[in-house]
Amino acid sequence: MKVAVLGAAGGIGQALALLLKTQLPAGSKLSLYDIAPVTPGVAVDLSHIPTAVEVKGFAGEDPTAALEGADVVLISAGVARKPGMDRSDLFNINAGIVRNLVEKCAATCPKALIGIITNPVNTTVAIAAEVLKNAGVYDKNRLFGVTTLDVIRSETFVAEAKGLNVADVKVPVIGGHSGVTILPLLSQVEGVSFTDAEVAALTTRIQNAGTEVVEAKAGGGSATLSMGQAACRFGLSLVRGLQGEANVVECAYVDGGSEHAEFFAQPVVLGKNGVEEVLAYGEVSAFEANARDAMLDTLQADIQLGIDFVK
């Protein structure tokens, strides 16, 4: 099993690479790429950790060597948010980065499962899809927007609010991966009830959690460590699915035939072909239904922005 991380010298990329080095199955290969010249050194640093995961690092303009034979590609390359920016402000720089990297994936590892971490995810996933279509290798079951950070934040905040063991808390999150498009389905959390005020407050906190981190870091970065953990969880789930493990379910932003938008985050079953099944997200509360319907114009505009960028 070979996993490639593109953007591996950045804050998310280094955190993700560390976690994958310690958690990938024995015998796996971890391939790190970044434009930054430090990247081979990051690989050497990680190679001193005593796990049976082989690490190689590649730097420069061309990621081809890092991508050869990759089963999973996780893309975190791009610029990070600064105070006063929202995820859409990142578009002008990150759109081109994602386009160029996915073009290389299409040429080098067209069957790989691709997880897009680079923001704005609502738009960058649409860019990736158009690039893969243009290359004639698009498979909607092999492209994912990684929204796992919204899920782990939801689990953490619900557990804190209700005094629960966070390991027992499961919160599906649907929609997209920015602002109002992030919709935690708190009505589906088992064994706990919320007042209307709690639902509104928790939903808003989950939607704005990225900004909470950006502001707390006072210009020194965005959510890199928690995002690294979220991306590792999702990447390991992709690997487990590829290895044939049953009942691997994660929420992800996919082209899954949703009635709501071309791309929509919802629970999916992961397997040897990527998405094996898109699961219905089930019954929602009136609050959630209203929030879902209210987000759709924003989500569809984000998607169209990505389509138009490639055309």
From Swiss-Prot:
Ribonucleoprotein is among the record's keywords: no
One GO MF term: L-malate dehydrogenase (NAD+) activity
Catalytic activity reported: (S)-malate + NAD(+) = oxaloacetate + NADH + H(+)
Active site: 177
Residue numbers binding NAD(+): 7-13, 34, 94, 117-119, 227
GO cellular component, one term: cytoplasm
EC numbers: 1.1.1.37
GO terms of biological process kind: malate metabolic process; tricarboxylic acid cycle
Swiss-Prot/TrEMBL keywords: NAD, Oxidoreductase, Tricarboxylic acid cycle
Disulfide bonds: none
Binding-site positions, substrate: 81, 87, 119, 153
Entry similarity comment: Belongs to the LDH/MDH superfamily. MDH type 1 family.
Protein name: Malate dehydrogenase
Record lineage: Bacteria, Pseudomonadati, Pseudomonadota, Gammaproteobacteria, Alteromonadales
